[in-house]
Amino acid sequence: MASQGTKRSYEQMETGGERQNATEIRASVGRMIGGIGRFYIQMCTELKLSDYEGRLIQNSITIERMVLSAFDERRNKYLEEHPSAGKDPKKTGGPIYRRIDGKWMRELILYDKEEIRRIWRQANNGEDATAGLTHIMIWHSNLNDATYQRTRALVRTGMDPRMCSLMQGSTLPRRSGAAGAAVKGVGTMVMELVRMIKRGINDRNFWRGENGRRTRIAYERMCNILKGKFQTAAQRAMMDQVRESRNPGNAEIEDLIFLARSALILRGSVAHKSCLPACVYGLAVASGHDFEREGYSLVGIDPFRLLQNSQVFSLIRPNENPAHKSQLVWMACHSAAFEDLRISGFIRGKRVVPRGQLSTRGVQIASNENMETMDSSTLELRSRYWAIRTRSGGNTNQQKASAGQISVQPTFSVQRNLPFERATIMAAFIGNTEGRTSDMRTEIIRMMESARPEDVSFQGRGVFELSDEKATSPIVPSFDMNNEGSYFFGDNAEEYDN
């Protein structure tokens, strides 16, 4: 783990706090979670949802999206300045599903954004509680990561679809703050930077004038965030070059894509947090759980414990497999879309299958889908064990440079080997080591070549029984060494389209 001297823990980022001790962090994260729960209960009352309807994940997502939209200042301002037909900039809404005469019915609701903001603030002791909003954004981002593929976005920015394991958080809004930046993968940051540089190439005024100065500050900040994710000196030095460039162009894009490829073996540190749907927090608050008093952590046992005793339902399309739908949501809840399936399956206590074998589409139901044939079923979100979420990227060898897998970004701090196809990855590095970053490139390639797939990551770390809340006796799983654990293997998921 990087030195904690200057870094705030990601619970602190998430709650916008300065440095606090563990108890204070647990309390402020608990306060944030409790606020989301209270807001959800109030919304269910407003909408007159039955207990069953309030536990429906699709209803939870609609309510979450409404509050995010109500607080999206920039978009609200834009909508007011550019009125479009049939869209009231002051209102927000979405589909709410109700059980009527044994059938699921869709009802489109509309609310004043002002009213939603009032309910949210009231649930959060009168504050704006931006941390809670970011938390909801990260849950949506984790759900997208598990559900959709970003092949098109990768190809558009000149990256390779096989780099999908670097794309965590690629659908997070820009306004998601420090907590959002912590969970973004290396590929996501590279993609944001490449898009920015391309705009600068096409638009002469992009870096000029007062606006250009702000753009430049944003560019350098993004470069620093990405630099902070890399764990080797050579990768960081290359990021300094990209950041200091007088006028960023194709050379910088090349460097960034080189760095993204290198991250397949020399992994970046990317935070993982278990962010659950609002209805889960609502259920717990309704049953009398005081999150602020008890304290809460996004990276420990708490989310597992919460999911052990919450019942959440989901709408199921006629030919979908409810077990597969459960797997999808379980992975989203634990931010495990890019984790090794062997690890996820071990923790969950059920076999976890690659996405290409899932008979399920996304959780959200499109407005043109036929409700007549919709059924609902219970999501199985419980686990056999729990494990600590990591942000190290799983490099062995004193956390410097070692093996990653072409398709894994570890979520859980659990001992495993990181199988990877060195040949596949190294093939991408033939030739181009000239230019001003040549010595860094050579150094990075040298480190990658000396990485061994059989090295063990997270040495001695294990999973814990759910009764072992203090994490005293780790159980270290043993895995078949050559079994590749990619979720994206044989992928046929839909593309993510806004």
UniProtKB/Swiss-Prot annotation:
Sorted alphabetically, the keyword list is: Capsid protein, Helical capsid protein, Host nucleus, Host-virus interaction, Ribonucleoprotein, RNA-binding, Viral nucleoprotein, Viral penetration into host nucleus, Virion, Virus entry into host cell
One GO cellular component, as annotated:
helical viral capsid
Q: Where in the cell is it found?
A: Virion; Host nucleus
For biological process, the GO terms are: symbiont entry into host cell; viral penetration into host nucleus
Q: Where is this region: Disordered?
A: 1-21
Q: At which positions is motif Unconventional nuclear localization signal?
A: 1-18
- What InterPro entries does the entry give? Flu_NP
Record HAMAP family = INFV_NCAP
- How does the annotation summarize its subunit structure? Homomultimerizes to form the nucleocapsid. May bind host exportin-1/XPO1. Binds to viral genomic RNA. Protein-RNA contacts are mediated by a combination of electrostatic interactions between positively charged residues and the phosphate backbone and planar interactions between aromatic side chains and bases.
Spell out the protein name for this chain: Nucleoprotein
**Originating organism:** Influenza A virus (strain A/Swine/May/1954 H1N1)
